[in-house]
């Protein structure tokens, strides 16, 4: 009996041993998602595609490795279903074929989010994978090798939530441990394989008596948790701050335009400034003024600019900032959103312009992955080609992105570019605060903190809306007036810890 049981499970144990060996020899990066390589389908397929998209150095290598891995996945599933006969092999191949499309879409969105630092792609990718795992994860283990019958049985048995929900909780917990304690990542691979085996074994047992009720209860709990999450993320508007001396220079981020950027709509009056004290940076250079549009105040200086101007070479942007910031009334406070953080930091850290305080809104401490130039065989070649192919689709959501513009190539396409900028310390006399968005935290594999006076508690506000949020206003008023920040809940970054293992290999894991 024991020999028969071992005979069934040894391929899963061998797969775990192979993953451990590959990680130990640096053939695959040791990132928290490593544990997903021995997870239930289709999470295992998601891990395969994340790794291959981000690390395959050429199309031939990608295709050969994908074919080999796909064949191994099909054989492993067939064996776990009972043996390598034609019917089980055909079932496994059909299952992975059905899941390939949505899983590839999720993996590509995942890799894109890390490459272009756009969390609005990351969260839908994770949600899609979660839906696929919960709805399709039980399908192969329903005791039949006919896919349609297996799908029907899965739904009739309530998606086996009594097995899948605890299993998913274990996977999330293992990923969180690997994220917090990287040294345990490789030892956790066999643990993940054991969890997978136990889940498969549990799904071969009879389902609950009332599976529909269990599924309904799970959906109700999920909806209730979502409502609570949304209802508790608001911030109370702070009391207006006292009048501030000097001037405030505001810089919008990438793909903005004159008067068209979230930071243009910042309530500068609540911060303690008047319109006569406020200046708006132009990516087109000095001029006699720009269209006001969404800006709180008339824009009296700078030339009108559009999204294409924000894509000019990085050093040109730094030069323009130096030119427009020099000579403004002191004390000079600079508020920079997103991409503009790197521009401002470069100018101030190199001593090219003198400022008194920096408000860094939605900064990214690193560019964790990058992507190779066209036609260059380097890790990420396949992903980069797909990114360039998909780039025109960004116009449909009014977020034009061209991965080969000078700014994108220098900062996003080059892994470590942001780190090299932010590695230079600011002058000692410059006060600075950093306010990240909690939704961006998964894209910061090496941490969110900058070398500044105050690293604010991550705000539960989406990245684009951060500069006009009550969270930013409160943090800024406190910082400018020397008041301490409110306590930061220890759970504020727990979401990022739980989901970061669903990202691509990035940051320190690649180094």
Predicted regions and their residues:
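Membrane-anchoring hydrophobic segments
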Residues: 1-144
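Short beta-strand/loop motif that positions the catalytic acidic residue
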Residues: 427-428, 434-440
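Serine-dependent carboxylesterase/thioesterase catalytic core
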Residues: 315-411
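Active-site catalytic motif of lipid deacylating hydrolases and related acyltransferases
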Residues: 246-330, 365, 374-377
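The conserved beta1-alpha1 loop
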Residues: 249-255, 336-338, 362, 436
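Membrane-interfacial entry segments at the cytosolic side of transmembrane helices
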Residues: 85-92, 154-159, 207-221
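Cytosolic-side transmembrane helix boundary signature
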Residues: 179-222
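Catalytic active-site module of serine/aspartate enzymes centered on a nucleophile-bearing elbow/loop
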Residues: 48-54, 460-511
């Amino acid at each position: 009996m024991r020999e028969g049981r071992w005979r069934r499970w040894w391929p899963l144990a061998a797969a775990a041993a192979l993953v451990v060996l590959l990680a130990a020899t640096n053939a695959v990066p040791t990132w928290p998602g490593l544990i997903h390589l021995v997870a239930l389908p289709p999470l295992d397929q998601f891990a395969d595609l994340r790794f291959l998209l981000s690390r395959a150095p050429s199309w031939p290598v990608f295709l050969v490795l994908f074919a080999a891995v796909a064949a191994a996945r099909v054989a492993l599933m067939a064996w776990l279903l009972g043996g390598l006969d034609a019917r089980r092999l055909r079932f496994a191949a059909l299952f992975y074929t059905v899941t390939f499309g949505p899983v590839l879409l999720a993996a590509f969105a995942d890799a894109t989010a890390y490459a272009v630092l756009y969390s609005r792609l990351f969260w839908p990718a994770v949600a899609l994978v979660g839906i696929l795992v919960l709805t399709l994860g039980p399908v192969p283990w329903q005791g039949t090798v006919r896919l349609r019958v297996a799908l029907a049985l899965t739904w009739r048995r309530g998606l086996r939530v009594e097995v899948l929900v605890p299993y998913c909780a274990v996977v999330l917990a293992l990923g969180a441990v690997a994220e917090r304690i990287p040294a345990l990542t490789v030892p956790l691979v066999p643990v993940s394989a054991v969890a997978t085996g136990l889940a498969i074994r549990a799904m071969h047992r009879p389902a609950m008596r009332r599976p529909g009720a269990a599924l309904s209860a799970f959906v109700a709990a999920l909806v209730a948790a979502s409502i609570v999450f949304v209802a508790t993320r608001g911030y109370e508007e702070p009391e207006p701050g006292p009048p501030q001396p000097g001037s405030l220079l505001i810089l919008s981020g990438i793909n903005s335009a004159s008067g068209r950027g979230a930071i243009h709509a910042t309530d500068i009056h609540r911060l303690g400034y008047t319109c006569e004290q406020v200046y708006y940076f132009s990516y087109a250079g000095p001029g006699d003024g720009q269209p006001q549009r969404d800006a709180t105040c008339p824009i009296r200086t700078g030339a009108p600019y559009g999204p294409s101007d924000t894509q000019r070479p990085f050093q040109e942007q730094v030069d323009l900032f130096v030119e427009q910031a020099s000579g403004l009334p002191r004390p000079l406070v600079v508020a920079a959103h997103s991409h503009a953080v790197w521009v401002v930091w470069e100018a101030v850290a190199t001593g090219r312009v003198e400022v008194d305080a920096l408000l860094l809104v939605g900064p990214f401490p690193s560019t964790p992955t990058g992507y190779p130039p066209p036609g260059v065989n380097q890790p990420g070649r396949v992903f980069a080609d797909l990114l360039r192919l998909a780039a025109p689709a960004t116009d449909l959501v009014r977020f034009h992105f061209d991965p080969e513009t000078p700014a994108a190539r220098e900062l996003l396409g080059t892994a470590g570019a942001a780190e090299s900028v932010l590695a230079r310390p600011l002058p000692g006399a410059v006060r600075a605060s950093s306010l990240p968005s909690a939704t961006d935290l998964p894209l910061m594999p090496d941490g969110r903190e900058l070398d500044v006076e105050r690293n604010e508690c991550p705000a539960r506000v989406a990245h684009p809306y951060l500069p006009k949020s009550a969270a930013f206003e409160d943090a800024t008023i406190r910082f400018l007036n020397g008041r301490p920040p409110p306590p930061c809940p220890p759970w504020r970054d727990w979401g990022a810890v739980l989901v970061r293992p669903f990202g691509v290999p990035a940051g320190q894991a690649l180094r």
